[in-house]
Amino acid sequence: MKKIDAHAHIGVFGGWAKLSLTADELIAQMNEFDIEKTLLCSQPNELCLDAVNKYPDRILGMVYPNPYDGQKAVDMIYDYVQNKGFKGIKCNPLKQAYVADDEIMDPIMQAAEDLDIPVFMHCGHPPYSLPWSIALLAERFPKVKLTMIHMGHGHGVYIDASLKMAKRYPNLYLEMSGMPMPSKIREA
């Protein structure tokens, strides 16, 4: 059976636990658990690029733009996808303080549509990344495959909303890392 990790990070994560993970350590974990490939969503983008270049057969890069950068962010997406082989876009409204369906996302989504690549979006932190807002973005860009990362992030109301929105919009997908409710994973 093929295993693909659809959402991983490397780098220094800080916090009380002082967590960190290098590309080499990620590959060691992948080998230990027979994971064939990993979609890497890390900032800064150069860190992700270094990992992709070091392990091109194992690590697939997701470019991480800041929508507040406007055209610069769009140009970066095109560069990373067309010239560096990245496979999609990762967005985190919570980290950069914008609401998921804000018009600031339109140039990012238009680039995804033009390049025919998916967008992964962190889901489950009010007021920025609620399932309803992500669904409105999916509705506005029906040709873009949009994945709700964490499927509501462990909050029952957001998990149920993620399930309902994914059923309503055919271009909206669920990703289940950090999901503490096996019954909801089965329901998905």
Locations of the language-model features?
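Catalytic pocket-lining loop regions of alpha/beta-barrel enzymes
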Residues: 101-188
